[in-house]
Design a protein with these regions (language model features):
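N-terminal membrane topogenic signal
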Residues: 25-42
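Membrane-interface helix-boundary motifs at transmembrane edges
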Residues: 28-32, 88-100, 149-156
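Selected alpha-helical membrane-embedding segments in polytopic membrane proteins
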Residues: 48-92
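Juxtamembrane "helix-exit" motif on the non-cytosolic side of transmembrane helices
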Residues: 52-61, 113-124, 173-179
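Non-cytosolic membrane-interface motifs at loop->transmembrane helix junctions
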Residues: 62-70, 123-135
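Hydrophobic cores of alpha-helical transmembrane segments in multi-pass inner/ER membrane proteins
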Residues: 75-88, 138-149, 205-223
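Central hydrophobic cores of alpha-helical transmembrane segments
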Residues: 103-106, 156-168
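Membrane-interface transmembrane-helix boundary segments in multi-pass integral membrane proteins
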Residues: 180-216, 220-221
């Protein structure tokens, strides 16, 4: 008799949380629709991930191999998003993976939007490609705001995420360990090639650090609110 084949149980969509708007700003119906279309979202992220690694091909070619993990920021975090969604849907959730996806997609989704408006001057550049980047990365930030529906942002998991993305900020802008700074190449408007004393470098660095802090604060705030709610429920019981 052949051994039975194990078929993973697909996770159901979790109920909504009673979170304040600053922690869960998307309408509950939109969150639920996103989770219902999880495989579509995975496919879109997969396409974006492939494009993202292709986009970084020249920068990777100029970067020592050991530092490659810190260069392709956006495709790396969309890969985290894919892994987060798939692990949840297949009933194999990993808190650290969800935290990496949340912090990373929120951070780099918003970071690219900031860069396009402050450095690449998207409003006057007249380049449709810049607007493509704005829309695509705004979508990354928005999808991060759905993760709380199925994720537990434990303190160790958030700690792992902030350690990774904090390290990324350090080697991107402040202390390159091997070779030069590893931040994403900027557009031509405020940047002189190879010159890290220009305003664009400071703007990008400030945005990256602030967004790392913001995403960490939001993840931990969601954790605190849930613990408070559970405490109230136990008190009523």
């Amino acid at each position: 008799t052949p051994a039975p084949t194990h078929i993973p149980t697909m996770a159901s969509i979790p109920a909504t949380d009673d979170l304040p708007a600053y922690l869960a700003p998307l309408p509950a119906r939109l969150e639920t629709l996103t989770l219902r279309l999880v495989w579509v979202v995975v496919a879109v992220n997969l396409a974006g991930t492939v494009f993202g690694f292709w986009y970084y091909r020249f920068q990777l070619g100029n970067t020592p191999l050991v530092m490659w993990p810190v260069v392709p920021d956006s495709p790396t975090v969309t890969l985290f998003m894919i892994a987060s969604l798939v692990s949840w849907k297949l009933g194999r959730s990993r808190s650290w993976l969800h935290a990496l996806a949340f912090v990373g997609n929120l951070k780099y989704g918003l970071w690219v939007v900031v860069v396009q408006f402050t450095i690449n001057d998207v409003l006057t550049a007249g380049d449709p490609y810049y607007w493509f980047l704005v829309v695509g990365h705004l979508g990354m930030a928005l999808q991060a705001l759905v993760i709380h529906r199925y994720a537990e942002f434990t303190v160790p998991a958030v700690g792992a995420a902030v350690t990774w993305f904090g390290f990324n900020d350090v080697v991107d802008y402040f202390l390159p360990i091997v070779g030069d700074y590893h931040h994403t190449y900027f557009g031509p408007h405020l940047v002189s090639v190879g010159d890290h004393d220009v305003l664009a470098h400071d703007v990008a660095a400030a945005a990256a650090v602030c967004l790392t802090m913001l995403a960490t604060f939001l993840a931990l705030s969601i954790r605190v609110r849930r613990l408070e709610a559970r405490g109230r429920d136990r008190g009523r019981g």
